[in-house]
A protein has these predicted regions:
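Glycoside hydrolase catalytic-domain context in secreted enzymes
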Residues: 1-261
Length: 261
């Protein structure tokens, strides 16, 4: 079945503009950082409830948000889209956001929330964003990798059904220095096995044909193969299915793996 999804569209005019927009006809609210400034999770849930009704009215069933990244690097251009740098506050706000959109149970009146960007897209080297090759590295001074996991762990405990990893490379945190979407240690070992997530892992947009940090030397079909075996279930922004079909026909990806997704 087709599921229509959307980036945030409720920000006040002249909002962030980086995967977050102000669209006519929808109610207007602050960015996530503005919600964090209220220090009031009930306000976040109220917003999410209203936004859910607006999404349902136009047929949107998946929200490509919230961003549960921690703003630990003040130079990062996407800090406005986070709930700040405090992991406990971000956790509380994330759960309220999810509850408002999804409801207490997932049903026909729910809009799924795709929490992003696992395992945290905030610790960008020099503040450069991972949409660009110059910002591909994520670093963890003070050995604080686990701190960035806290909001995502809390989301998984509260009925998270779909999650998005970021473009960046978690430098020297895993066996390979490759981007999250190609990193089995991140997606299968950490997210699936250690944290216990059993929903859908959807890649960020264009990881095969655009932003494939750490695997630039692989061919397109090899990137598909590596990302699927790493744990990706759904590809954002990629539309060519021929490579997937070929991988299955050549037994490089088992049909059972596709069934799992």
């Amino acid at each position: 079945p087709i599921t229509i999804s959307s980036d945030p569209i409720h920000e006040v005019p002249k909002g962030g503009g980086v995967a977050s927009f102000s669209v006519d006809g929808f109610s207007k609210w602050p960015s996530q950082l503005g919600f964090a400034a209220t220090n009031n999770a009930s306000v976040v849930k109220k917003f999410a409830n209203i936004a859910k009704e607006e999404y349902l009215a136009v047929g949107i069933r998946t929200a490509l948000h919230p961003m549960s990244d921690l703003a630990t690097e003040p130079r990062w251009a996407r800090n406005f889209g986070t709930f700040g740098s405090n992991a406990l506050m971000s956790s509380e706000m994330t759960v309220a956001y999810m509850s408002g959109f999804q409801g207490e149970e997932i049903n026909q009146e729910s809009v799924l929330t795709m929490v992003k960007h696992f395992p945290g897209g905030g610790p960008q080297k020099d503040g450069l964003d991972a949409h660009l090759f110059s910002g591909k590295d994520q670093i963890y001074p003070g050995n604080n990798f686990d701190y960035h996991l806290i909001p995502f762990e809390e989301a998984v405990k509260n009925n998270l059904r779909v999650i998005m990893p970021y473009y960046g490379i978690p430098v020297d945190q895993t066996q390979e220095n490759v981007a999250m979407a190609f990193n089995k240690n991140i997606l299968s070992d950490l997210l699936r096995e250690d944290i216990g997530f059993n929903g859908v892992i959807c890649s960020d947009w264009g990881i095969i044909t655009g932003r494939h940090w750490g695997v630039n030397d692989l061919s397109i079909i090899e990137r598909y193969e590596k990302s699927i075996h790493a744990g990706i279930d759904q590809f954002g922004g990629e539309t060519d299915t021929s490579h997937l079909i070929r991988l299955v026909n050549e037994n490089k990806v088992l049909e059972s793996r596709i069934d799992d997704s």
